[in-house]
Amino acid sequence: ASGGDVNKATTGLGEEFETLNLGVKPYPSCRYSHAAIDGLIELKKELKFSSDDLDDIDIGLSETALNIIGYPLTDKQHPKSVVDGQFSMPFCAAVTVKSGGLQWDDYKNHLNNKDTLSLCNKIKVSPDEDAEKCCPEYMSAKVKVVVKGEKYEKFVKIPKGEPENFMEDVE
């Protein structure tokens, strides 16, 4: 093309590597679910609870996230396919509580699992001011759990896999 500026295309070549600014998805689900998954993993490690110990789970999300992975809640609590599961905060949270994370095989193992689907019904989603303030730069979440009558909360501003919170080699 005429009028192009080759200097714009080569500025920083060999010095600036834009791939270092890309995020990597550690879980096979909608990126909006990842901060909540991270928060649940952290709470499980800290509190050592099982699904039987849970009285309540509420995932606080931005409005954008709620519209993608939270609403309509009844549909999100009853995913019928892998894609439904990928875009269901209740399902992703239930699997994380049951298995300690979320991997591809979890869809096969949990989509028709009565215990997992029953746990989905305990999981609520709600608007969260802190998550909203971080959106759209970060896909944040606040996880609130009630374990054996005690309330706990974890806010994850930057989910794993973002350049500012990149995964460790073992992850």
Regions of interest found by a model, annotated:
Residues 1-171:
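Terminal-appendage/accessory-domain detector
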